[in-house]
């Protein structure tokens, strides 16, 4: 669903920010 896709994108963004 759209909600799940949004959660996945948020998780990827958070991980990317931590790795930066």
UniProtKB/Swiss-Prot annotation:
Residues 3-12 are annotated as: Plays an important role in the hemolytic activity. Its main location: secreted. It comes from the Eukaryota. It is found in: Secreted; Nematocyst; Target cell membrane. GO terms for biological process: killing of cells of another organism; monoatomic ion transport. Residues 11-20 are annotated as: N-terminal region. Keywords: Cytolysis, Ion transport, Membrane, Nematocyst, Secreted, Target cell membrane, Target membrane, Toxin, Transmembrane, Transport. GO terms for cellular component: extracellular region; membrane; nematocyst; other organism cell membrane. One of its GO terms (molecular function) is toxin activity. Octamer or nonamer in membranes. Monomer in the soluble state. Pore-forming protein that forms cations-selective hydrophilic pores of around 1 nm and causes cardiac stimulation and cytolysis. Pore formation is a multi-step process that involves specific recognition of membrane sphingomyelin (but neither cholesterol nor phosphatidylcholine) using aromatic rich region and adjacent phosphocholine (POC) binding site, firm binding to the membrane (mainly driven by hydrophobic interactions) accompanied by the transfer of the N-terminal region to the lipid-water interface and finally pore formation after oligomerization of monomers. Composed of a long N-terminal alpha-helix and a core region rich in beta-sheet structures. Before the pore formation, the alpha-helix binds the lipid membrane, partitions into the lipid-water interface and stabilizes the monomeric molecule on the membrane. Finally, it traverses the bilayer, thus forming the transmembrane pore. Belongs to the actinoporin family. Sea anemone subfamily. This is Equinatoxin-1. It comes from Actinia equina.
